[in-house]
Every structure is written in C-alpha cells, then in structure tokens.
C-alpha cells in the first residue's frame, strides 16, 4: 500500500504530487512462534476433541445429541425439567432446550432483565452428506442399490470408491424411534459407491472435474450376496 501526498502550489494555480512515497506495511507474526509448551498441549487437546466430535457426529441429530451430552457435563439443565419442577431461574443458572432433536438453544442466565437486551451467539450444524430418496431400494445386475440425492456443497468425485457409513433415524408405525449406524465399526458391513475402471473411463476422464461424476450416478451398493435358498426365483 502506498500513500501519495498532494499539496497546493503557493499560487493556487496547480496541484503537485509530492515525490515522497510512504510505504505502509503490517507485520504478521506466526501464532505458532508465540505458543508455550502448555499452549501447544491445549491446542492439540482441543484438536483431538474436535476430531472425535466430527468422527462421531455425521448428521444434525447426532450433533445435537452430542452437544446436549457435552452441555449437561458443563452444568446445563433441560428447561423442561425446570418447568416440570416449577423451579425459578436465577442469575448464573445454565439451561438448554431442544426442538425435534435438530435444534438446540442454551442460556446462561444473567443478572439484568431481558428488557435490557441479551448477548446472542448463533451457529448452524453444517452436515454435507448424501441422503436416501423416499423409496431408495432397487436392483441392477443382481446387486441391491440405494438411490440418493446429495445435500450441501459436496464434491461428488470424493464420494466414489471409498467406504461409506449409513446414519439415520427410522420411526416405526407405533412411534418408536430407531437410530441406525452401519459402517463405523470395523465389523460392520461395508457400503459404497462404485466407479468405472480406468480402462473403461476414457470418456469420463475427458470431462471436467465437476462433471466427471454426476449426481444420478451416486447410487450406493448395499448388497451383493444372494439368498441362501437355492430354489428361490428371486435371490
């Protein structure tokens, strides 16, 4: 960045640019250079907790469930319990409320009235993923597959030929909720999206990165073993 200084001539007849240039620079120091040993330990400890959270929580509901668990360990109490017990909130109390398992609000009660305002810190759960369609199951070439549609800003080429996991919630007719997680344990079945072999993909390789894998091709292989009944017409 340069600052040029202009001055009026004494006679006011012309404007002259001062030849002197003032170069403005801002120096930035690496944060790593300022960290003590204790600071570094704290940084990596936080990173480990963050990785654990991201590895465990793949959907909005899972993030909210885990966040509530962390909040309760930090002293937060469910607002429903406060209301049920007809308790009164006071300054310093910590309460939370959740909505449909996908929204969480947490309050640290202050000393002044809400009429004087409140500090709000907001965030959203960003969960890029591939969702199953309403009736996803179909068969092709004796293989069972799920039709999908993607949610969020996913790079489609990153989702093929890599082990995937299924996370979801099933609500039975009687209202019972079943949480499903398949693929996170090493002993779980493996699901994934296939891709063309290198010697069959000349046309695909000629396409741009954005078009090499299209959304309609993101179908998940979920079964390839036939039924044990050898006489069954449909296996």
What positions do the PLM features span?
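N-terminal hydrophobic/helix-forming segments and targeting peptides
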Residues: 2, 7-235
């Amino acid at each position: 960045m340069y600052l040029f200084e202009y001055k009026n001539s004494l006679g006011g007849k012309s404007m002259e640019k001062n030849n002197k240039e003032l170069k403005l620079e801002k120096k930035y120091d690496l944060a790593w250079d300022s960290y003590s040993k204790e600071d570094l330990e704290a940084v990596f400890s936080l990173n480990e907790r963050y990785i654990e959270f991201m590895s465990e929580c793949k959907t909005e509901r899972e993030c909210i469930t885990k966040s509530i668990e962390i909040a309760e360990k930090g002293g937060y109490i469910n607002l429903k319990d406060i209301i049920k017990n007809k308790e009164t909130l006071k300054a310093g109390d910590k309460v939370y409320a959740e909505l449909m398992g996908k929204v969480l609000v947490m309050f640290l009660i202050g000393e002044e009235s809400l009429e004087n305002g409140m500090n709000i810190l907001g965030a959203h759960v960003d969960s890029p993923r591939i969702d199953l369609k309403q009736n996803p199951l179909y068969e092709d070439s004796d293989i069972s597959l799920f039709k999908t549609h993607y949610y969020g800003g996913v790079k489609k080429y990153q989702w093929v030929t890599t082990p995937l996991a299924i996370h979801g919630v099933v609500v039975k007719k009687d209202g019972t909720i079943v949480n499903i997680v398949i693929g996170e344990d090493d002993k779980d079945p493996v699901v994934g999206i296939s891709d063309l072999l290198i010697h069959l993909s000349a046309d695909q390789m000629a396409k741009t990165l954005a078009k090499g894998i299209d959304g309609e091709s993101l179908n998940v292989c979920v079964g390839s073993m036939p039924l044990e009944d050898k006489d069954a017409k449909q296996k």
